Amino acid sequence: SMDFKISEKMQATLELVDEFVDKELLPLEQDYLTLDFKDLLPTLAKKREMVKKMELWGPNIPKELGGMGLSMVDHGLFSERLGRTPLGHYVFGCQAPDAGNIEILHLHGNEEQKKKYLKPLARGEIRSCFGMTEVDMPGSNPVMMETTAIKDGDDYIINGHKWYTTGADGSAFCIVMAVTDPDAPPHLRSSMIIVPTDTPGFNLIRNIPVMGHSGSDYASHGEIIFQSCRVPQKNLLGEGGMGFAMAQERLGPGRIHHCMRWLGICNRAFDLLCQRANTRVISPDGKPLASKQIVQEWIADSAAEIQAARLMTLYAAWRIDTVGPKAARDDVGTIKYVVANTMQRVIDRALQVHGGLGMTDDTILAYFYRHERAARIYDGADEVHKSTVARRILEKYK
């Protein structure tokens, strides 16, 4: 049965989240756009404490680790509300890549790893990063990997070159995907290894400028060179050779979180679009932009596209909750490109309606435009998802 009803408890929670975002986070956006992220950390720490007191910390984090332990659908709804501002997920403790790292540490970590890395991470006392993408290898095909972890006594010695490692700057540890058995079949060659960032040989070379902005701390994307970086073999996460499988397992739920966050961005851009269309007077007789048919068309198209993308995403989340990630993989693959493209169109229309103002940092739109164009690239480019989904559909017709 298909039930779109949100429980009363969840509805009340979402209203609290909306109110918090409006009152506590939106006023910080101008500082976020102009200051270093590091400079905002004391303020954000206070906001995080407020969230914890309200018992809204970690919607994705299991209850036994101090989070809310929400279902995929409820977390999706929560994520949509947080997505309206770039600060939402961070302040509520469910930001990528930590959310995915918490998930795989919870599923695959041993007791020592959980105590040392998972618990402080879940409490928001430390941050982490995830090192998969490599400079010379195709990001969409993680079976192709040059970073190696070679056994030496009781240790691994890691050598390799990673980049686009979100939030590496300021992280306590990195979960690194590296080849541990080059002779194994392609999908069984790599493993996940926990590498504390203060380990000699872990070299964060730079924060890569994204469309001109290099950022700092959590709001950055690092390039890392591993030079004979030695960590104990007990830092292996899960079983050896399961790196690819764990990466896939991490990405499924992650795509739901991303899509719902993007829908939050769509909603925010749509609000700004409509407000601007109604208030921007364009003729002496007082007619606003909203009186133009083309602007009305953008508004109607945006509303329909957001609603369609939202229902598709909630359906995919419901499928993960009911039949599991593997059976829902086509639903998840499809929403990844549908929602990313919807977001790009809605942001673009909102920016256009703002005219020259849309290109400045006086609104949040230019920030969204810069940073969310990548949505069609990371976690599987549009073309890869489309090709995979199409192949599975065609199989049914053979």
Show the residue positions of the predicted features.
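Flexible, glycine-rich active-site loops centered on histidine and acidic residues
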Residues: 102-108, 130-131
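Long, acidic (Asp/Glu-rich), low-complexity accessory segments flanking structured domains
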Residues: 228-246
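A short, Trp-centered hydrophobic/proline-enriched beta-strand micro-motif
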Residues: 124-133, 177
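Alpha-helical interface subdomain recognition
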Residues: 2-89, 94-95, 108-113, 120-125, ...
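Flexible, small-/acidic-enriched active-site or ligand-binding loops
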Residues: 144, 198-230
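Hydrophobic, small-residue-rich alpha-helical packing segments that form membrane-like cores
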Residues: 137-141, 145, 151, 156
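Short Gly/Pro-enriched turn/cap motifs at secondary-structure boundaries
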Residues: 121, 136-140, 164-167, 182-184, ...
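A short core secondary-structure module
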Residues: 159-205
